Amino acid sequence: MRGSQEVLLMWLLVLAVGGTEHAYRPGRRVCAVRAHGDPVSESFVQRVYQPFLTTCDGHRACSTYRTIYRTAYRRSPGLAPARPRYACCPGWKRTSGLPGACGAAICQPPCRNGGSCVQPGRCRCPAGWRGDTCQSDVDECSARRGGCPQRCVNTAGSYWCQCWEGHSLSADGTLCVPKGGPPRVAPNPTGVDSAMKEEVQRLQSRVDLLEEKLQLVLAPLHSLASQALEHGLPDPGSLLVHSFQQLGRIDSLSEQISFLEEQLGSCSCKKDS
């Protein structure tokens, strides 16, 4: 019974060794390891001279020897052919429980603060940490106070918002409300908003008035343009020059009429006398 148990254990050992050697095969993240051939032992017949005592003539003890032969072993000058051996490539190791699967990356130094090794020498850091081994804290408060409404307090790997004295943080963390109730809008004692609105309305009224005046100014020009075409003039400017000339003639005629009226008046006075 004991002999059969020993044979069974021997077979299990052979299977385990063979399974380990055959667990790896060339492939992804599995590399061939350079193996040296093992020395070969060979057997040979060794001649040995064995001394012994015997009885010679005259009943004397004599020493002589005899030749015997036995099997001996010696190392052969050659080497046995090396079998290919495989192992995980540098930077990778076996995944626990999966023989032959080299899926676990190795990071040296190891990743810190909850970081995971995703590739040899490369760590993936959780939120709040950075660096080659996730050793440095990220200062969330350096950019826009971390989104806090009033104060931002940076901690190792995280941050939190803090309100001024007399205020408390809202449930969603976006507002700091006065303790005892929601914030109320304080009246504006300076009346800046009202004055600004009045100024905007006043400027808008001026713009409307200027637009009306512009239309009044442009109306004669449109009329002049049509009249210039009627008089055969090339442009409204020529019509203006022509109109000014006519006005000059009218003024001259008015002066002459006034002079004639004065003369007529003086003549009537002399006739009456």
UniProtKB/Swiss-Prot annotation:
Bilayer-spanning residue ranges: none
SUPFAM superfamilies, per the entry: EGF/Laminin (SSF57196), Growth factor receptor domain (SSF57184)
Disulfide bridge partners, by residue number: 31-89, 56-62, 88-102, 107-117, 111-123, 125-134, 141-152, 148-161, 163-176
Subcellular location field: Secreted, Extracellular space
Positions of the EMI domain: 27-104
InterPro entries: Dev_Signal_Modulators, EGF-like_Ca-bd_dom, EGF-like_dom, EGF_Ca-bd_CS, EGF_extracell, EMI_domain, Growth_fac_rcpt_cys_sf
Stretches of the chain forming a coiled coil according to its record: 192-219
Signal peptide: 1-23
Span of domain EGF-like: 103-135, 137-177
UniProt GO BP: angiogenesis; blood vessel development; cell adhesion; negative regulation of Notch signaling pathway; positive regulation of endothelial cell proliferation; vasculogenesis
Motif (Cell attachment site): 130-132
GO molecular function: calcium ion binding; signaling receptor binding
Domain of life: Eukaryota
Other known facts: Endothelial cells depleted in EGFL7 by siRNAs display dramatic alterations in adhesion, morphology, and sprouting. The defects are in part due to diminished RhoA expression and impaired focal adhesion localization.
PANTHER family linked: EGF-LIKE-DOMAIN, MULTIPLE 7, 8 (PTHR14949), EPIDERMAL GROWTH FACTOR-LIKE PROTEIN 7 (PTHR14949:SF21)
Described purpose of this protein according to its UniProt entry: Regulates vascular tubulogenesis in vivo. Inhibits platelet-derived growth factor (PDGF)-BB-induced smooth muscle cell migration and promotes endothelial cell adhesion to the extracellular matrix and angiogenesis.
Protein name in the entry: Epidermal growth factor-like protein 7
Organism of provenance: Homo sapiens
